[in-house]
Amino acid sequence: PYVDSTRLGVHGWSFGGFMTTNLMTTYPDVFKVGVAGGPVVDWKWYEAMYGERYMDTPQSNPEGYAESSLMPKAKNLKGKLQIITGMNDPVVVPQHCLSFLKACIEAGTQPDFFVYPGEPHNMRGHQSVHLHERITQYFEDYLK
């Protein structure tokens, strides 16, 4: 099998959104296109039951939280990154996306952003169809 290394894309939701954004900003010369849905951007804003289970508290592990934050990596973005969130997401609150967007603005990088008004962490029904069409179209537009 052949992989065109000039046209690699990555997609994920929630932790997968974190990984997508992390890959796009850690390996900006490897990944051309990414779609990050409901991405965790800074673990100090995520649910304590999950983050603190693995990382302890932000107060007791400030270095770990700082190292895993995607905010400082916003300056590294080169490819096309679509960030998507549900505006009523109680799991990965929109603050994650908005803070990353602010960091990108300050760094002069240009991600794309799409919001589903009134939607929670996972899309259902017509919104889910729209979401998957949007993701597919993004890869069609930027990986061909």
Predicted regions and their residues:
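Active-site-proximal cap/loop segments of hydrolase catalytic domains
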Residues: 1-144
